[in-house]
């Protein structure tokens, strides 16, 4: 079986469970969460974070709810062409059925997930008396490896496809050779970010630096990866050939840079 024709021989459905189709994407998503939690526990123990495994497990449940809500709502607001419909029919936003058939919840936005994650993290920190910025540092270094599985899930689900190409490692999608952009993102936004953040741990100057650094680096990696990724059909290219993903990444990076400067200045003030 040739790599270029992988999709012709691959079924995105892993197996049926009592009539319910379980997709490889769903399995990859669960693995992403478990890997991120495992890395968080490992780093928390290695770097002596004042958090127990029970607290981390509880925190990840909060975060998972926030991520799902934020990702879905973010997609509706940023990408979906039927935003007005969903705003007037909010009960349809999380409806996993279509014409009586279970199709799961489709349409998620990373940038919306970040917003949901931040809100859930803030509420958890307030509820349990945990430092918010400490959580950001821990998550910033634990998310990237889990993210790798998320993008692999996108690849197996044949979604978020790449742009048309002639490179020998391209993959045919509906008869058209395209970049396997999901795998590029898994490498850039996952593996590369983890290596950088892991190495930076010993150089941290203020609490929250790793968390903010992750968002800035992700925005940069995503901006670059978008040049290989096909823009959403319902949106296409924006002004100057920029994609919605690139625009949202810039919108995320700019306030993060400002926040970095503010927290760094605040820390220097403590030292002086």
UniProtKB/Swiss-Prot annotation:
Q: What EC numbers are recorded for this enzyme? A: 2.5.1.145
Q: Record's GO cellular component, any one?
A: plasma membrane
Q: Which PROSITE patterns match?
A: LGT
Question: Alphabetically, which GO biological process terms does the record hold?
Answer: lipoprotein biosynthetic process
Any GO molecular function: phosphatidylglycerol-prolipoprotein diacylglyceryl transferase activity
Q: Name one Pfam family in it.
A: LGT
Pathway noted in the entry: Protein modification; lipoprotein biosynthesis (diacylglyceryl transfer)
- Where can this protein be found? Cell inner membrane
**Top-level EC class as recorded in UniProt:** transferase
| Protein name per UniProt | Phosphatidylglycerol--prolipoprotein diacylglyceryl transferase
